[in-house]
Amino acid sequence: MKLVSTEILIDKGPFSSSSDWQEIKTQISQAIKAVEWPPGSGSFTIRKQSGKKRGEGSGVKPIKAAFMAKLGDFGWNLETRVDIATVKTPGPLDATKPVGDKLFAVEWETGNISSSHRSVNKMAVGLLKKKLVGGILILPTRELYQYLTDRVGNFRELAPYFPMWRALNVDEGFLAIMGVEHDLVSTKVPRISKGTNGRALA
């Protein structure tokens, strides 16, 4: 799998010039690149099949699971509960890495566009409350989105709202959106079913 775009929404303070960010960026890039299909192929080939009809298209959650497993191998904490923007038990962040007394968070979108908004908002509030030093939401590009099941949030659909997050008055922190995409498209590979073990893809 490949990273094709990074949109930086907030970059305040020294973090993006730090060795911590260089390590985080490298690990995220390596974890994306490690996601492959079919297993053992060395690249990510998506089945050329629209996800609009029931029982067609490739599942999103196994792709996310493969990426998260690789971050776990790098020592990231998975499914971290951080009290950021909730009054009840907070929903977990997909992956976090300690940076000093704060956390850097990564979310990989498997829900719809409303879920994407919630993820970015949660990380933005984390910056405002100084609980996060930074955060990244990873989304499929529109090119990959068409082959995935369900109506998963995607980069192009979220882009019109980027100015809103850029306008936030954050003293210090980093917030970005990454777009990921397949390496190849083929009718000769199987679809990724929703029940596929994510470990098989990494």
Where are these regions (language model features)?
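Active-site metal-binding core of divalent-cation-utilizing nuclease and nuclease-like domains
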Residues: 50-58, 62-101, 112-121, 128, ...
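Catalytic cores of nucleic-acid endonucleases
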Residues: 110-167
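Structural motif
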Residues: 102-104, 134
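A broad, low-specificity signal marking well-ordered, structured residues that form hydrophobic/aromatic
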Residues: 93, 104, 175
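Residues at the C-termini of beta-strands that transition into short coil/loop
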Residues: 82, 139, 181
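Domain-level recognition of nuclease-like catalytic cores that cleave nucleotide substrates
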Residues: 142-202
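Interdomain/boundary linker segments immediately adjacent to catalytic/signaling cores
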Residues: 1-82
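Short catalytic-loop micro-motif centered on adjacent basic/acidic residues
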Residues: 105-109
